[in-house]
Swiss-Prot record:
Domain of life: Eukaryota
TPR repeat residue numbers: 91-124, 129-162, 163-196
Gene that this polypeptide is encoded by: Dpit47
Official protein name in the record: DNA polymerase interacting tetratricopeptide repeat-containing, protein of 47 kDa
Organism of derivation: Drosophila melanogaster (Fruit fly)
Predominant place of localization: nucleus
Amino acid sequence: MKQMAAQKAWTDEERLELAAQLDAELDAFIDGLEKKRYEEGWPEDRWQEEMDKHPFFMKRAPQPGDDVHPMFEGLQKLKYDPEENTRDELALNYKEDGNFYMKHKKFRMAIYSFTEGIKTKTDNPDVLAVLYNNRSAAHFFIKNYRSSLSDAQRALFYKPDYTKARWRSAQCAYELERFDLCTQMCEELLEVDVDNEVAIALLHKNKMKKLEIERNQRKEAAEAKRRLTRFHRLRDAIEQRAIKFDDQKVGKKDVLSEELLYPKFLPLEDHPVHLDEDGSTLIWPAAFSYPEFLYSDFYQQLPETTTMRDCLATLLTEKLPYDKAHNYRLGNVHVYYENRKVGCVHKVDEEKQLAEIIAEKGFFVSGGALLFYVVHKDSRVEQEFINERRRPMVYS
């Protein structure tokens, strides 16, 4: 065999020169290849957006209305297609979705997923019990206690020894103030685990709340009875005095109601007519209007034994805000009341008590209060007020 020629000894400069030559030849080869645009990938300006849509890289589940990646649609079909899954598998897939939403506190989406699982009509009672219990939990977290209780009870129907569902039932029953059911659920939990601390605590809390509500109900019932008794006494006193109300229809005597006695004037609305402590004197809310100034004064509690002069003495102690001439003073004013039924006014005798004025044939309580008009005596304002055209009230 022929001996091979001895290898050439390369210097460093020769090696560098050869490497540069090979790089240049490779670049020339690449530049000589046919140019073709890359069109099969994601556009550079939407690369991140497309990445987020891809089922392998997405960071969150698609929301309603989002564009869904075709691969994601395919995976969904594999997961939810009835032809690809049994009823149990479909129910478990929806349960898995619901648990995912529960973990991320998307409780309404969780309710939707668990509901879809129930709709699969799986025959597995354990799966149905879990779906109902989990949907009960989702309802509970958004305070849909009635729906939560209903689902927890359904879970117990499919799985009578389901501790979680029984505890959820107890919690919902407490929130809904169904105290007997809460007691029953807690006692059943304690039959299984006598040392169940949360059940013991809820049982005690439930008992205390029941006692408190029953006590409050007794107080409210007693107060309602007292209020009704006071109203009946007030009604009898008003009827005995034959007091008339302009809200009552002509020719008809309506049964007196609290609404009829309720003052319609804002400053008086919390001070309806009532009897004094000994039950002998009516205390009235009253309004005194000054037509000249479009201004009113209010008495929140005015005994019927008060004379009109006493009322004026109090009202006119200080100068009225708009009375620059100081015409409105005791002895220099007249007081009227209006009979809206027939559309006329009546002058008030200042020496009479309110009870006497109210008893006059033409006087009607207006809007739950006594209403009087004060005008400057013998003035143009008084004449205009008296002669003002008034239309009688019309009732059907």
